[in-house]
Swiss-Prot record:
Subcellular location: Plastid, Chloroplast
Keywords: Chloroplast, DNA-directed RNA polymerase, Nucleotidyltransferase, Plastid, Transcription, Transferase
Any GO BP annotation: DNA-templated transcription
Name the UniProt record assigns to this protein: DNA-directed RNA polymerase subunit beta
Molecular-function GO term, any one: DNA binding
Gene name in the database record: rpoB
InterPro entries: DNA-dir_RNA_pol_bsu_ext_1_sf, DNA-dir_RNA_pol_su2, DNA-dir_RNAP_su2_dom, DNA-dir_RNAP_su2_hyb_sf, RNA_pol_bsu_bac, RNA_pol_bsu_CS, RNA_pol_bsu_protrusion, RNA_pol_Rpb2_2
Family recorded in the similarity comment: Belongs to the RNA polymerase beta chain family.
Organism name: Angiopteris evecta (Mule's foot fern)
Taxonomy of the source species: Eukaryota, Viridiplantae, Streptophyta, Embryophyta, Tracheophyta
Enzyme Commission number(s) from the entry: 2.7.7.6
Subunit composition and interactions: In plastids the minimal PEP RNA polymerase catalytic core is composed of four subunits: alpha, beta, beta', and beta''. When a (nuclear-encoded) sigma factor is associated with the core the holoenzyme is formed, which can initiate transcription.
Its biological purpose: DNA-dependent RNA polymerase catalyzes the transcription of DNA into RNA using the four ribonucleoside triphosphates as substrates.
Amino acid sequence: MILKENKKMFVLPEFGRIQFEGFQRFIHQDLVEELTNFPKIEDIDQEVEFRLFGERYRLTEPCIKERDAVYQSFTYSSDLYVPAQLMRRRNGRIQRQTVHFGSIPLMNSQGTFVINGIARVVINQILRSPGIYYDSELDHNGNSIYTGTIISDWGGRFKSEIDGKKRIWVRLSKNRKVSIIILLLAMGLNMNDILKNVRYPNIFLRLFQRQAENIQSYEDAIVELYKNLYSAGGNLVFSDSICKELQTKFFQQKFELGQFGRRNLNKKLNLDVPGNEHLLLPQDLLAAVDYLIGVNYGIGTLDDIDDLKNRRVRSVADLLREQLGLALDRLEILIRQTIHTVARRKRLVTPKGLITSAPLTTIFQDFFGSHSLSQFLDQTNPLAELTHKRRLSSLGPGGLTRRTASFQVRDINPSHYGRICPIETSEGMNAGLIASLAIHAKVNDRGSLLSPFYKISKTLGEEHIVYLSSEEDEYYRIATGNTLSLDREIREERATPARYRQEFLTIAWKQIHFRSIFPFQYFSIGTSLIPFLEHNDANRALMGSNMQRQAVPLSQPEKCIVGTGLESQIALDSGSVVVSNQDGQIAYLDGETISILLQNEKTVDIKSIIYERSNNNTCIHQRPVVSQGERLRKGQLLADGTATVGGELALGRNILVAYMPWEGYNFEDAVLISERLIYEDIYTSFHIERYEINIYTTSQGPEKITKEIPHLDSYVLRHLDNNGLVVPGSWVETGDVLVGKLTPQEAENSLRVPEGKLLQAISGIQLANTRESCLKVPIGGRGRVIDVRWIYDEDTLPNIANMVHVYILQKRKIQVGDKVAGRHGNKGIVSKILPRQDMPYLQDGTPVDMILSPLGVPSRMNVGQIFECLLGLAGDILKKHYRITPFDERYEREASRKLVFSELHEASQEAAIPWLFEPDHPGKSRLIDGRTGDIFEQPVTIGKAYMMKLIHQVDDKIHARSSGPYALVTQQPLRGRSRGGGQRVGEMEVWALEGFGVSYILQEMLTIKSDHIPARSKLLGSIVTGKSIPKPNTVPESFRLLVRELRSLAVNSDHNLIFEKDLRKKVKDV
């Protein structure tokens, strides 16, 4: 973006840099510090000393390439080697060796980690920064209670409070509190020290007289603290055992402020404690309580705990450093145990004999495999991938939980301005807890979020960029982004909207310190792709941001006519496109390889990705866009990737839409489409499914991959080669065998079946002692086999495979039940596919591609879609592409509407289509019914909208069951498609069936089809023999379960048969 005033080019940041910067900090800084802090280890007699030289560590080059790690299902990692020294003081002998510490997974060029062939990403956690925070709460009487909470970096928290009687307590748990005076005296301070170092000595003196008058010494304070903590009565006397118990259970509890906590505490309480003192000291507690008294009297400020200055981001560096620290702690314990054992047995040992690679390797494996912040990378499309790397989570260890997080924590805070996107977040339970970084935000070494601003120099008249944290920018007056459009002279005359101390106000330009740099500065990359964003309700913009990440890459992608200008940057930073790193010339080109002849006569080969499966089963494929012999410049596009065209992100297609009702088929967000979208492959996508089968060694011997499978029809084995694997290129249907496998079993088991006994009795034939356990194509898995891979375990012997992967490609056209959406939160399900001749058509005979409901616009307040489709129509006719920045009303009122109408008018004039822009109803046109040829009564809004097909496809959701598993307890069918579940008729379904009076269907659903075991078993026989289905004469299993549950509560239930005449007699007697 070029700014006229200062003639400077402003460059967008690299969107994936938060991941790269974090990992580089871990490798170059945190790893060295943790290894350097590893302590010297000595035996009991101090004769043997072990130490590490962490600053001279070495990471080896990975033994496998990034792409091969994915292909062979390996982990992309590097081995860590550290020099170690073992010294024996008795004879002065020193042994130095470089020891193997284990393997550390490496970040690849995409900013992700490849673990067992699967791309994973470590997302950033945002949580409360350690330090002290002052707040006020209401007690049960409605009175304000002032509290000060010290949050640790590692450990618990201290909460001090002043109650209604002006007494000061330290709360240790929800129900336990202790007087601050008793605690300070027990921590070793005396009354003189306390009174000298506080601003309010009189208050402390009164407290001492009211709460601790009987305490004359340190010993009395220890006894009193013990009574308060453990509710001990009687006349306790000070003893070493009481003191020792308090030391171990209370004072030595891990409470570490850390580097950031110490800095925050010193700053807030004006202390001069050294920065390397990370533990909580008595003077910290004293100063904290002294400040709390001041807050109670109106001196000092309360903290907004949700302000970003009180929160910090734990990046991948902090999370990996924490895991490394745990591994080194575990290793230290193992080394100590080994040294003590060796010293006791008088054995010799080397540094390599002391260190094992297990702790580091296993801890990193557990972290990447099961930690809540190490996630399966969302690879639906390039935008989803990039957004996942820029995600901020308040959940995870040390963070919030989705059930206890309040509305206040989830809400937007003024400090988020330019740092965290106010639009993009999850829907549902995680709303407000999962956020996304704003476009220009970055994280510094202290974990603070920074946003860039132009600093306005009053003297020089120049501007330069400054990054400010939330703590810094509240002291400055910052003009908002709408001032970008104004000339300097006009700006200085007008009052300017600005932000100061988290409030919005209007002030003169000469009072401004900083100004925003970019209209998109406040939003995430997903939200920044929505054109005319300012005309949409925030809830719909949120849905639009989220649904773009669910768009399936199409086989024939198309760039949007109306965009925002960020599409090329997102495509580049996601890593889906290939660009040239140097000047040169294309020497050779085919579908898989691009060879570039450099200026120094060397040749560089670049391998393209061909039909690779993503984590979300979408297809990753790169297409060359250069020709042989073409000259290249550095940075030039070589190949388009998934969902990109010409180096720009292309998630959907520009199609002709009309906003009108059509026979009720687009009721409630349903969508009507033309069959042209199917026949011309407009919304056709490729999906690659991976099926795997393990090869085990059983107690009876190893399993065998073979084509010779007894008891199976040769038809289902027709695609297998001689080795028992399916041939790549085969078209397979449901039930076909992909991998033939035989599992050995005990001979006795096969002879127990009646056929086995009969064969053995007649002719002495021994039945085969194997059973088939083949990999077969599941229901809905039909497609083309594109690859078959043997997978070898990294830790086992070479050439012994333990798994086979089969990849099947499916070509899916759009169909009824698929979900489609625009970029403005306008989503819908395809309800009917009409022939082209039945679709409404324009006055020039062009049939409409999609009919949307007009009632979906006014109530949702996402008018941006109307602007987009009208401007798209003008762009389609004029052969133009538009890139619109948001908030264009800063130029003039109704700027968006004027732009759209002026472009429509120009298109109407140029193409000589008068009905394209009619002044009586601009943006609307008369449509003709394709079935009757009649003109519809009202003019209809038509346009070219950019619509996407989403990953929620009917093929993945539709499910039917004829037979399947039952739950053990209730004996009812399991729930869910993945478990092969069936129908479960609940109360409301029963009411619906009762309303129609279908008693037999209802009776079958509640008994035979569900949980009536005897009736279920008799049903098959009656169907086979053609007899009538027997009526159940016992109760279903769910009733038995109810009876058992009542019995477990000591309530017995019984039933007796009462004849009608007996019942009449009893009623008569009553």
